[in-house]
Amino acid sequence: LTLFIVLFCHPCYCQSRSVNARKPQDQIPIDSCLYSITYTYHYANDTTGKVRLFDKQVLEIGTTTVHYYSKNAALIDSIMFQAKVAVNPRKSFAANERELYEDIYWNYPHKDSIGVYTGLVNVDYFYEEPVPSMEWKLTEDTCSILGYTCFRASTRFRGRSYTAWFTPGIPISHGPWKFNGLPGLILKARDEADLFVWEAQNISREQNKKVYVMNPRFNKIIETTRTKLLRLQEKRWKDPAGLYVQHGSAMHVRDNKTGKFMKMAPGQLVLPYIPVPELE
């Protein structure tokens, strides 16, 4: 049986930017940031369980808005658009460290809603939905995270069961990703299969820091819905070559036996299931 290595079409460092990189200068301030919480997000690359990756992510609490995004993606954007010579923006990354281009905004662009920007291939998709309702079951179980006493809570949300640890010591009803609705800041969360784990690493009180959003005047953004985006994300494993063709790109694989690269046609390749936090 011939083995293949999938080569996704990321442009080379010296001539081009990461496929989802966003120019920092094209962002606009929308709020003042009061708190920044840095999380490490560990996730399974696929359900074979052989590879676990991680991203460094940030939750910014503003006066009226909340922003959750990849710190690694922001770092790559800054390096790529400031570099005057050839540079590898991931040089300081660990072997299993990645950057996930997804930005989640609370109360933006409208109050009582969340706006989500997701990078897929070479396009930013945007959708808006009402603030998700999470029904939590609280317990008396406790643990200590970053010196804060945290309580355990559990919920079922969009097809998956999650456990979260929150601290009433910081009365902010938010957390990583879309988690919300608990009487305190969520410092750790995981799903029942341990496919996804978020854990806080640092909490900072901010001064003179802004919350930014991409300026649609300077960025290619396609408006969609959450369910339509989920269907597109499914193609990452059901038909990845078709997904790239759909976005005006291409996918090649290398034959481990011959070393030759081959262009894949839509429907020609299926990958192990790539989990997503939302199933429905």
Predicted regions located by residue number:
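Bacterial N-terminal signal peptides
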Residues: 2-11
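Extended soluble regions of mature proteins
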Residues: 16-280
